[in-house]
Structure formats: C-alpha cells, structure tokens
Amino acid sequence: MPVNLSMTPINKAKAWGVHAVTASGVILALLALLALVDNKPQACLLWLGLALLVDGLDGTLARKYEVKEMLPHFDGSVLDLVIDYLTYVFIPAIFIYRYIPLPEHFELLAVGVILVSSLFCFCNVNMKSTDNYFVGFPAAWNVVAVYFYVLDLHPWVNLATVLVLAALTLTRMKFLHPFRVRQFMPLNIAVTFVWLISSGLLIVQQPADLPILLGLWFAASAYFVGICLWRSAREWFG
C-alpha cells in the first residue's frame, strides 16, 4: 500500500496513539475479569461491550493514520488478535460457565467447544471475504453472552446454540462486519449503535419487563441476521 502520509514524528506519534487505543482493550479485559471475580455479571458485560466498541473503531483509525506503514516493525494485528481472544472468547466463556444455565455435566463441554472452535476462527487466514464479511461465525461469544443473559433461555437451548454456532465457524456462511463492509455501511453502523445502546440498557435493568426496548433490540438483531442470510444466499444461489 502506498504511503500517503509523510513519515514525520507527529504522524508516527499518531500511529502509536492508535496502537494505544487497541491496547486499551486489555485494560477493559482486566476490568471485565475483575467484575467476574467480584460476582458482578452486569459490569462484566458492560466492560466487554466497551471493548467491543473499541475493537470496532481502532481498525478504522489504523487505516486512516496508515499505522502499518508508519510503524512497520510493530504488528498491530497480532496485538488486536491477542486482546480479541480475551474479550470475545476467553472472558465470555468464563461468564457463560458461571452465569448461564447449561445442562448438568455439560458445562465444561460447552466452554471447551467455545474455546477450541474459536482458535480455528482466529487462525483462519481466510476468515474475511473480499467484501470484508466474516467467513464463518466470527467467535463473537461476547455478543452471545449478552443474548443468553438477557433472554434467560432453557439450559438445553443454550447448549444447542453453542454447538450450532461453533459448527458455523467451519462454514462459508457470511457474517457482517459493520465497520468494514462498504455496502450499506451508514445503515450498518447506525443499527450497530442501536443494538449496543439497547443491549447496555437491557443489561443494566435486568431483570425487567421493557417491551419497547426489547422490540428495538430484537429489530436490530433481526437486521443483522437478515443481512447475513442475504449475503450468504447471494453466494449459495448466485
């Protein structure tokens, strides 16, 4: 990629600043883990949600400030993957083990499936399509944990969901990356923020009967499911 910015100390400092934004995710991971230790599930999910937002934005900043070209000796993608495994997979897996009902004697199996299947996702060099959709379920167990917590599903439904999503990791099904997919990007980002805000409010107010907020949350969720199925169907059926 050609370098459009000059290699000045200020531009290099900006690039390091972007890496600092990415690195802040490990502090958020620590806060989420400490919330688990302190038996504060809502705080844990909120810290993970903030980490999700940081992860969604740092890539945009990295491209804007040409971080890879400014600092070729420091691989921000490795930094990102390390933090993502903590905030998308490892801590959510512990959260699910501790707070989400699973069938008796199947708890460790479910968590093990989450951890191992996610390793494939993180090591898959073909995890992105040419139009920046994720190929296969992108190990977004932080998002899954929110659904489990808010919906309070039956233990067997939770286990089946874990197994199905883990299996989808190995498929060619497309999953939206709202900050990278160019098509419908403004709408994708708007719906993402609707989902994030409504999720945060539902987490804070659990358990609560909030039909309007739940309706908004489900509508945003339905949009994501719909666009993923639409993009996958385009490939399946030409």
From Swiss-Prot:
Enumerate the transmembrane spans. 17-37, 42-62, 76-96, 105-125, 133-153, 156-176, 184-204, 210-230
Record-level Gene Ontology MF annotations: phosphatidylcholine synthase activity
Q: Which residues lie on this side of the membrane: Periplasmic?
A: 38-41, 97-104, 154-155, 205-209
Primary location group: membrane
Q: How does it sit in the membrane?
A: Multi-pass membrane protein
Q: Which InterPro entries match?
A: CDP-OH_P_trans, CDP-OH_PTrfase_TM_dom, PcS
Instruction: Spell out the reaction equation it catalyses.
Output: a CDP-1,2-diacyl-sn-glycerol + choline = a 1,2-diacyl-sn-glycero-3-phosphocholine + CMP + H(+)
Compartment(s) where it occurs, according to its Swiss-Prot or TrEMBL record: Cell inner membrane
A single GO BP term for this record reads: phospholipid biosynthetic process
| Residues in compartment: Cytoplasmic | 1-16, 63-75, 126-132, 177-183, 231-238
Class of this enzyme: transferase
- Stated EC number for the protein is 2.7.8.24
**UniProt entry keywords in alphabetical sequence:** Cell inner membrane, Cell membrane, Lipid biosynthesis, Lipid metabolism, Manganese, Membrane, Phospholipid biosynthesis, Phospholipid metabolism, Transferase, Transmembrane, Transmembrane helix
Please report a single Pfam family linked to this protein.
CDP-OH_P_transf
Cofactors = Mn(2+)
One Gene Ontology term, aspect cellular component: plasma membrane
The task this protein performs is described as: Condenses choline with CDP-diglyceride to produce phosphatidylcholine and CMP.
Family note:
Belongs to the CDP-alcohol phosphatidyltransferase class-I family.
Task: Please report the name of this protein according to its UniProt entry.
Answer: Phosphatidylcholine synthase
Organism field:
Pseudomonas aeruginosa (strain ATCC 15692 / DSM 22644 / CIP 104116 / JCM 14847 / LMG 12228 / 1C / PRS 101 / PAO1)
